[in-house]
Amino acid sequence: MLIFELSKTGRQAKAQIPRAVSKNYSIPEEFQRKSRPRLPACSELQVVRHFTCLSQKNFSIDTNFYPLGSCTMKYNPRGVHKAASLPGFINRHPLAMDNESQGFLETLYKLQNYISEITGMPGVSLTPMAGSQGEFAGVAMIKAYHQSRGDTARDEILIPDAAHGTNPASAVMCGFKVVEIATAPDGDIDLDELKRKVGPRTAGIMLTNPSTLGLFMRQIKEIASLVHQAGGLLYYDGANLNAILGKVRPGDMGFDVMHLNLHKTFATPHGGGGPGAGPVAVGKRLIPYMPLPVVKKTDSGYHWATRQDYPQSIGRLSCFMGNAGILLRAYFYMLVLGKEGLLRVSEFATLNANYLLKELTKVGYTAAYPDRRASHEFILTLNSEKKNYDVTAMDFAKRLLDYGVHAPTTYFPLLVPECLLIEPPETESKEELDAFVAVMKTIREEASKQPDILKAAPHTLPVKRLDDVKAARELDLNYFATHE
């Protein structure tokens, strides 16, 4: 039911908070509405019940196992949220002067240093407000670097065919042409093709390591050497940093710039359209181009660095500092776990993934790369299930919802047919993993004996199987278009 269907003329919810605006204040007539807004007329209780019921129908990390591949849906510790909500942080105004913000600035300065140590890169800017914006910032810095050297012929970015979709989008937004590099049969990047395509027009290469196939790129040092010898730079997509946290540093692999997804690796909240944060870390040669502001430390305390400090900066990406509340959560997460705790994060994440992969193959599923160990995630291919039972990966994904499990990432990466990309984060217990295996075993048995159950799934959710094509072509987004 939509909230408009609860509406009754004359019903209202009185505000219980005093108005901030004086009653004597009036909006100029030219800016005043000529008709009432079409808002539902409901009581406060109706509104609370309506949205509470909707929230109970959602899948969430707090309520369900959430093995969404390449998304690292780990638990968000409540103590971290509490620390980030201390009055000294949440009551600070974004325009507060440096001398009134020393505690806040010191915290961000320490976060910059922690990220530098984790990534093996000396420069850090916290200002990007999402992983995708951090990615854009990284590519923009690569462009600024080449332009400052007069190397304007470099107009190509190399990107593997298993990359995240944001990689080519960021490259194109910065004015580059995308050159795709194929994946070899063993899951690694095709080195021979890379050697053919790298050259004087190469500005850089964008990689995720481990890749989105759930495999660690074993020839990364050779790849770095090839690209650097050609005059290009290496960009690290931090989407899968959870797999190598404390074990391997991107800077030590030869990467020049990267972004971090705080909502993945450092347990800040996912989704909801924001807020987010995607800090960037850079090697020495890209420090002059970092987006502002960054925090610097002097004898007089902590201060915002300005364009005067970084005249070649690519500039601002957001108002103020970015999403400070998310940055604080990441800082306290690092502080709570410490160096040893962060190391265990990657160890348990890879242990969970490899255990789950092994158990799923025991009950009949096929690994996309059976000769390789998983990193923090892995891919099953349901090609044989489609051929034998006429059920698809999407059918399996929809049926999982009936068992209270959020579906894994489906049909991505595109180069694996009937693909399920599964990532069990380090916060999940062995009992939870075993329960998931039992559900997957049951669904596979259903596929072999009663495939129609899968084809019609989900059966228990308020929204059943949707007609994706019709939904895309016949948009119905306006309640009043059909309810005048």
Swiss-Prot record:
Known catalytic reactions: N(6)-[(R)-lipoyl]-L-lysyl-[glycine-cleavage complex H protein] + glycine + H(+) = N(6)-[(R)-S(8)-aminomethyldihydrolipoyl]-L-lysyl-[glycine-cleavage complex H protein] + CO2
Swiss-Prot/TrEMBL GO biological process terms: glycine decarboxylation via glycine cleavage system
Gene Ontology cellular component terms for the protein in this record: cytosol; glycine cleavage complex
Sites bearing N6-(pyridoxal phosphate)lysine, chain numbering: K264
GO function terms (MF aspect): glycine binding; glycine dehydrogenase (decarboxylating) activity; pyridoxal phosphate binding
InterPro entries the UniProt entry points to: Aminotrans_V_dom, GcvPB, GDC-P_C, GDC_P, PyrdxlP-dep_Trfase, PyrdxlP-dep_Trfase_major, PyrdxlP-dep_Trfase_small
Cofactor entry: pyridoxal 5'-phosphate
Enzyme Commission identifier(s): 1.4.4.2
Gene3D superfamilies referenced in this protein's UniProt entry, alphabetically: 6.20.440.10, Aspartate Aminotransferase, domain 1 (3.90.1150.10), Type I PLP-dependent aspartate aminotransferase-like (Major domain) (3.40.640.10)
Highest taxon above the source species: Bacteria
Keyword Metal-binding: no
Record keywords, A-Z: Oxidoreductase, Pyridoxal phosphate
Quaternary assembly: The glycine cleavage system is composed of four proteins: P, T, L and H. In this organism, the P 'protein' is a heterodimer of two subunits.
PANTHER family on file: GLYCINE DEHYDROGENASE (DECARBOXYLATING), MITOCHONDRIAL, GLYCINE DEHYDROGENASE, DECARBOXYLATING
Family label: Belongs to the GcvP family. C-terminal subunit subfamily.
Function: The glycine cleavage system catalyzes the degradation of glycine. The P protein binds the alpha-amino group of glycine through its pyridoxal phosphate cofactor; CO(2) is released and the remaining methylamine moiety is then transferred to the lipoamide cofactor of the H protein.
Protein name from the UniProt record: Probable glycine dehydrogenase (decarboxylating) subunit 2
Organism name: Legionella pneumophila (strain Lens)
Upper taxonomic lineage: Bacteria, Pseudomonadati, Pseudomonadota, Gammaproteobacteria, Legionellales
